[in-house]
Amino acid sequence: PDTKLIQYLAKHKHMSPFGHCFASFHVKAPVFVARQLVKHKFLRWNEISRRYVDSEPEFYVPDVWRGRSEDKKQGSSGKITVSSDLARNMAESAKKDYEYLLDLGICPEQARMVLPQSMMTEWYWSGSLDAFSDMCLLRCSSDTQAETQEVANQISMKMHELSLIHI
């Protein structure tokens, strides 16, 4: 392939040729991050379902809590000092409730209703480099939620590392 031409096209945002190249990623992130990312068009999504997988639920607890942005409806700013014990205790309680329901014979598709947005989920995400480029341009920006931005940055770095496309 003509590497110079490919880099030129990417640099100048001539993305249509990248609609013919595909990539797939295995992603693990909290449910609340997954729900933001699933909205991107033209990317195939296959999430691992608790209906079929009996693994023990894992939960995301942030190291740093952020304050609410004063100048936007969404977003965050600054750091708030608060213990993560509440989130850890809630996750542990939800896990116990989930296991209790399963022990009662409740089907997994109903028992999972007690699991919180902080539960980790995994999915396989495939699409064209053009579609991933569009997702990264939107989700790597500084006004994106930090946890979502982290996933987008990791995908962007992996694409760069593989010299697929430089976003």
Language model features with spans:
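Family-specific signature for flavin-dependent thymidylate synthase
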Residues: 1-165
